[in-house]
Curated annotation (Swiss-Prot):
Name of encoding gene: LATH
A GO term, aspect molecular function: lipid binding
Protein name, as recorded: Latherin
Subcellular location(s) of the protein: Secreted
InterPro entries found in the cross-reference section: Bactericidal_perm-incr_a/b_dom (IPR017943), BPI_fold-superfamily_member (IPR051902), Lipid-bd_serum_glycop_N (IPR017942)
Family as reported in the entry's similarity comment: Belongs to the BPI/LBP/Plunc superfamily. Plunc family.
UniProt keyword DNA repair, yes or no: no
Originating species: Equus quagga burchellii (Burchell's zebra)
Pfam families reported for this sequence: LBP_BPI_CETP (PF01273)
Main location: secreted
Biological function: Major protein in sweat, has surfactant properties.
Lineage: Eukaryota, Metazoa, Chordata, Craniata, Vertebrata
């Protein structure tokens, strides 16, 4: 069973507008990246010391998120048939200047998966509840038009893995509460539409 397109588009349009009105993408600029940078430094400094000799300190390192874009949202029934998943795809770039390496720019594509579920009160009335919210990295790729140096090649895998862990754990902690607030303030008619969709799916199954 698929979510009717006319219902899905109403809900995704409202969510998209709410994200844009709430400056959702600007939240990325407020996320503390110091921990991420320190983790990357800790993991690659030893290898770089071996490859190129003693390095300067972390004052020569910099990281920032930039060029964030919100892509087309979508809805689908959860695999367990007990709710609806909202998929929110994001694209962004990560600029990284690391010690003596040339500056790197990594392209990131990640999906936010937020689950909506039903809860009932003592009177048997249903309300929409915000369930699990996770970030799933889909792609982390170095943007470059030039051949990679031996040094960059040696540390790139470590950087990509560390960035992936950060997206899954820290970035989700920064963005998911805002999604929760947005869902809590959805138009009542849209909330009722979502509740009815979940109930109808449960009855079919």
């Amino acid at each position: 069973q698929q979510i009717p397109p006319e219902v899905s588009s109403q809900i995704t349009d409202a969510l998209t507008q709410g994200l844009l009105d709430g400056n959702f993408l600007s939240l990325l600029n407020a996320i503390n990246l110091e921990g991420l940078l320190n983790t990357i430094l800790d993991q690659v400094t030893g290898l770089l010391n071996i490859l190129v000799g003693p390095l300067l300190g972390s004052s020569n390192a910099e990281i920032k998120l930039q060029d964030a874009r919100l892509l087309q949202l979508s809805l689908e029934f959860s695999p367990d048939s007990k709710g609806i998943d909202i998929w929110i795809p994001l694209e962004l770039s990560v600029y990284l200047k690391l010690l003596i390496l040339e500056p790197l720019t990594l392209y990131v594509r990640t999906d936010i998966r937020a689950q909506l579920q039903l809860e009932s009160d003592e009177d048997g009335k249903y309300r929409l509840a915000f369930g699990h919210c996770t970030l799933l990295p889909r792609a982390i790729e170095l943007q470059t038009g030039n051949p990679l140096s031996l040094t960059v090649n040696a540390v790139l895998g470590t950087i990509e893995n560390t960035l992936g862990n950060f997206i899954t754990e820290d970035l989700g902690a920064g963005l998911c509460p805002t999604l929760n607030s947005l869902v809590s303030n959805l138009n009542l008619q849209l909330v009722n539409n979502l509740i009815n969709l979940i109930l109808d799916r449960a009855n079919v199954d």
